[in-house]
């Protein structure tokens, strides 16, 4: 191959973004290839849809596999390029020979005689070009790890922003349902109601401040990590000799990034005891509200419900039936009028759905959340995160998840369904009044989300 052909061949191994030999090359949908780090840095923080820096075509696929052929050829091209290793800084003072070897143990450049000395002869030594490529591989892994932290932090920041706005809406809703519940009480509790509303306002303001502070910390952390990522990217493109002398503190930096990663706020409001509420509810108590017959139930969550429960991860959240892990218990009777109260023990399950729904027990086993005239409180656990929510419309409940018995109160004539934490004597949530048009039956499903 003559020099012109060689130059053409080498040009095919150069990334058009950094104008260096490829580092961890990927080939995107349009056929153009780039260093993965270059693509991450210039593709709007790595979020899809991404546009090709060369032809501007949209690429739907967010992640690409490494082009192993390009990677190998680029590595060989780097190792065969001229190395400026004869500078005075790279001449051994003791033996006056060029340092052409790298000591893996001491992370130092050595000349031949030094590598055979008693101090180094038991260590592993590599040619500088080969050692530099090994070092770049380690740097790429560190960069991948750093980018994962970056993406996780960015997702947390987006979720934190969403939580801030949804919490504001929730606090407004909670004020209304607290006021409505006190209006239903047979005794005047004006002072207690005002105390609860004022306490709710104080707690909410504290949580809003925590969320705002968290957003600032995450934004600052993203900037630091982007700078660190760019620094590692620049280190990868250093000449071999400079690279090997500069790489000692890489792992310490990425470990520090993980340790300093801000954790998202998990906002939780106090649900205060309402004096006499359980005594009032027990006047309408229904014994054996639920049947003793358990039926395998195939639960599907509508997309808006999954989004509320799982946030930005809702597309990967479960939608399909969970098979025999899910069982439903229907009410022993359907209600068409009056007030009715019953309790269900949820102590033994983290995943459950509780409430009332249109009388459709004879329908097939497929059950979709959310549909008309289905009023549910939903508890779910994914990884180590617990979520409490309601449907119709989907709404996260920013109160502590009940761990014992949950009370359900149906006021059919006034079109309302409410949930209570029995151990606290507190209101969890009350659906806004509506008009029921069909019989409603108690429903409980566990192990279903």
From Swiss-Prot:
InterPro entries: B30.2/SPRY, B30.2/SPRY_sf, Butyrophylin_SPRY, ConA-like_dom_sf, SPRY_dom, TRIM/RBCC, Znf_B-box, Znf_C3HC4_RING-type. It comes from the Eukaryota. The keyword Metal-binding applies. A zinc finger (B box-type) spans 87-128. One of its GO terms (biological process) is innate immune response. A zinc finger (RING-type) spans 15-56. GO terms for molecular function: ubiquitin protein ligase activity; zinc ion binding. The keyword Coiled coil applies. Zn(2+) binds at residues 92, 95, 114, 120. Residues 268-449 form the B30.2/SPRY domain. GO terms for cellular component: cytoplasm. Residues 189-225 form a coiled coil. Keywords: Coiled coil, Metal-binding, Zinc, Zinc-finger. SMART domains: BBOX, RING, SPRY. Belongs to the TRIM/RBCC family. PANTHER family: E3 UBIQUITIN-PROTEIN LIGASE TRIM. This is Tripartite motif-containing protein 64B. The lineage of its organism: Eukaryota, Metazoa, Chordata, Craniata, Vertebrata.
